């Protein structure tokens, strides 16, 4: 297999609750390095919650996150950034005076590996 298509990260049995509301229930998926991925679903399906957990904005209540095959804890965005994970927020969280590219790299420090 080509090195560029190895598993970059995976969510295993991730659950996230906000009080009595279960936003994500036992979610598992993997993302391959070098691919293009989309997260799609209805409003309220938990897409933003999944992305915010990957970016370290919310901790999962249960389950595990693996990065390059190793169990990892992404509890703050700085950890995600150090792993090469970036996030482009929805329109209301973008900086309107910046270009698309500048919004993408906002807060990004140079690294040897990116997702």
Where are these regions (language model features)?
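Glycine-rich phosphate-binding loops of nucleotide-dependent enzymes
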Residues: 1-115
């Amino acid at each position: 297999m080509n090195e560029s298509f190895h598993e970059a990260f995976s969510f295993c049995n991730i659950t996230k609750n906000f009080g009595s509301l279960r936003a994500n229930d036992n979610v598992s998926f993997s993302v391959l390095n070098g691919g293009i991925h989309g997260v799609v679903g209805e409003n309220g399906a938990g897409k933003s919650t999944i992305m915010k957990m990957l970016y370290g904005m919310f901790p999962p209540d249960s389950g595990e996150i693996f990065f390059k095959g190793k169990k990892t804890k992404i509890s703050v965005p700085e950890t995600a950034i150090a792993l090469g994970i970036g996030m482009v927020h929805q329109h209301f969280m973008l900086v309107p005076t910046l270009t698309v590219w500048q919004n993408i790299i906002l807060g990004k420090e140079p690294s040897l590996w990116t997702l």
